[in-house]
Amino acid sequence: MSKNKLSKGQQRRVQANHQRRLRTDRKPELDDSQLGDAQEGIVISRFGQHADVEAADGVQHRCNIRRTIKSLVTGDRVVWRPGLQAQEGVRVKGIVEAVHERTSVLTRPDLYDGVKPIAANIDQIVIVSAILPELSLNIIDRYLVACETLDVEPLIVLNKIDLLDADGRKFVDGMMDIYRRIGYNVLEVSSQTREGMEAFEQALAGRISIFAGQSGVGKSSLLNALLPPTDNEILVNTVSDNSGLGQHTTTAARLYHFQHGGDVIDSPGVREFGLWHLAPEQITQGFVEFRDYLGHCKFRDCSHTNDPGCALREAVEQGKIAEERFDNYHRILESMEQAKPRKTSDSDEK
């Protein structure tokens, strides 16, 4: 038996302690008298073994995290205890005691660390794209698959439309119509001219959203345009002149409040959103327009490529499924196959 493996009795004690800490009405223990009463809070941001927790009165507190807490991310609802003033005049950090059950969690697979959670308790993923650094339908489709798998509503936002001339606008409208036709909500906005921003604010109201998308598409600029001027501005970098790719500006996921009542989590940008932790069947189901045709192929094990009698390919040829989406579906499956052997190889070496 591994010396790090907990016995059943130890596991029961850990679980019992966790449940006890979820009771906010309990009395502080004598051996931690420098901490106040337990109360509810929400994680605003996580920094290593510390987290910023917002109390019910809106005040944020830097807290340590109990070692028994296996996972803590921005958006988590927690039970925490504030630090009291020590005799030496040094402020004692608070401590996160327990985490409430999540309604949802957005995860990102990592080739070396496995599946990594990004944010919790979100009910809307704002997929931000732009004509610069690149209008990538592949990245949009990856996030849409994640939304469908998590059962979280997506909102596609195309930023920087002020950079488009009439022909460019017509081209972009055609690309976005691919998503409108299959039921997705799409907004075209500009954080510079504020075109479309009022509709964007309405879509954010009453929601806990997360901004997702490749670097350089203007996620931070959009947030700065939406946040009240009293809030600190989020760092904004331009697209790199050398690579043409966006430079990462957000270093840790952080939750912000809007005056209209919505909450937004700004997360580090990603250039590619991996989905290799999902089964191929989940990817297929993640394309909503495919669902009416699944089960109608000639062969039960149809790969939806060049197999005779493929219902999906016939739908593409008939214009019922966008060819761009069908191609991205196969690109996602191919990228999964390329990533999995690397992950397996890394695990074998350990």
From Swiss-Prot:
This protein's record includes keyword GTP-binding: yes
Chief subcellular location: cytoplasm
EC number: 3.6.1.-
Cofactor entry: Zn(2+)
Domain CP-type G: 103-273
Residues at which Zn(2+) binds: 297, 302, 304, 310
GO CC terms of this entry: cytoplasm
Composition bias, Polar residues: 1-17
Record keywords: Cytoplasm, GTP-binding, Hydrolase, Metal-binding, Nucleotide-binding, Ribosome biogenesis, RNA-binding, rRNA-binding, Zinc
GO molecular function terms attached to this record: GTP binding; GTPase activity; metal ion binding; rRNA binding
Gene3D superfamilies documented for this protein: Nucleic acid-binding proteins (2.40.50.140), P-loop containing nucleotide triphosphate hydrolases (3.40.50.300), Probable gtpase engc, domain 3 (1.10.40.50)
GO aspect biological process, one term: ribosomal small subunit biogenesis
Keyword Glycoprotein set for record: no
Segments for region (Disordered): 1-35
Positions annotated to bind GTP: 159-162, 213-221
Stored InterPro entries: G_CP_dom, NA-bd_OB-fold, P-loop_NTPase, Ribosome_biogen_GTPase_RsgA, RsgA_GTPase_dom
Assembly mode: Monomer. Associates with 30S ribosomal subunit, binds 16S rRNA.
Function, as annotated: One of several proteins that assist in the late maturation steps of the functional core of the 30S ribosomal subunit. Helps release RbfA from mature subunits. May play a role in the assembly of ribosomal proteins into the subunit. Circularly permuted GTPase that catalyzes slow GTP hydrolysis, GTPase activity is stimulated by the 30S ribosomal subunit.
Protein family according to the UniProt entry: Belongs to the TRAFAC class YlqF/YawG GTPase family. RsgA subfamily.
HAMAP family in the cross-refs: GTPase_RsgA
Name of the featured protein: Small ribosomal subunit biogenesis GTPase RsgA
Organism listed in the record: Yersinia enterocolitica serotype O:8 / biotype 1B (strain NCTC 13174 / 8081)
Gene name of the record: rsgA
